Amino acid sequence: MAFLSKVGRLFSQTSSHVTASSSMLQSIRCMSSSKIFVGGISYSTDEFGLREAFSKYGEVVDAKIIVDRETGRSRGFAFVTFTSTEEASNAMQLDGQDLHGRRIRVNYATERGSGFGGRGFGGPGGGYGASDGGYGAPAGGYGGGAGGYGGNSSYSGNAGGGGGYGGNSSYGGNAGGYGGNPPYSGNAVGGGGGYGSNFGGGGGYGVAGGVGGSENFAQGSSTNAGFDDKFESNQPLGNDTDHQTESGLGGDEQFGGSDNQFGDAENGNTENGPVGFDQTDDGDVAKRA
């Protein structure tokens, strides 16, 4: 155990020495560069104005403003190259100064590799230019080419479809629902007819590949929403002509078990009241009188 701890301390000391050496080499490399990074420039600043501002500190070989590849607008930073490192060092005096209404930041541009071959220059953070190296920006890389949150390489990958978070269709649409083509248990959360399409008509709660499979929610028929065997009824819950129930909780008849419906569909008047409710007729009135 003691031996392992000694080896660990030795590795940590070696790592610290390597880090210090690399930092020192990086500083030397920065100070020996004739290219500087200029950040925070105004969007109205062009390369001619940039060259004019830095030419008072030495001969400017190149002044390049980095622009967006799609819109062509300035990304707010640039690189200026001088003929010598001394001139680049003199240009550091513009750090924190105002240029065309904006306070700019000036630093040495560091040369770095890209990881895919090719080399470029970077500012205080990030890299510009993807696989070919390119230039470094203060706020990270360019970020294009790999699709957005809901692009072709979306958050859910191919399972989410070729677009948004939930695929090409709606939450319970025909093609790809919340989980896309390979969902949780079927083709879509809501199946082929929407999340709850035609609750009393064709296509029950989870018809054609719902959450639990390919049957209805209550294992009933598709015309009465799966309640055939649940309330001892042989008729649909919702009649298409009068919107009244033809069968109720007690079997083939209505709530009170009589021959008449509680709410008759033809005249809209109730012939029998609810269970336990006594209707008054002319005989009762005469008896009370």
Curated annotation (Swiss-Prot):
Disruption phenotype: Reduced growth rate and delayed flowering. Residues 1-31 form a transit peptide. One of its GO terms (molecular function) is protein homodimerization activity. Its main location: mitochondrion. Keywords: Mitochondrion, mRNA processing, RNA-binding, Transit peptide. InterPro entries: Nucleotide-bd_a/b_plait_sf, RBD_domain_sf, RRM2_NsCP33-like, RRM_dom, SLIRP/GR-RBP-like. Signal peptide: none annotated. CDD domains: RRM2_NsCP33_like (cd21608). Homodimer. Interacts with MORF8/RIP1 AND RBG3/ORRM3. Binds to RBG2/ORRM5. This is Glycine-rich RNA-binding protein 5, mitochondrial. It comes from Arabidopsis thaliana (Mouse-ear cress). The lineage of its organism: Eukaryota, Viridiplantae, Streptophyta, Embryophyta, Tracheophyta. The gene is RBG5.
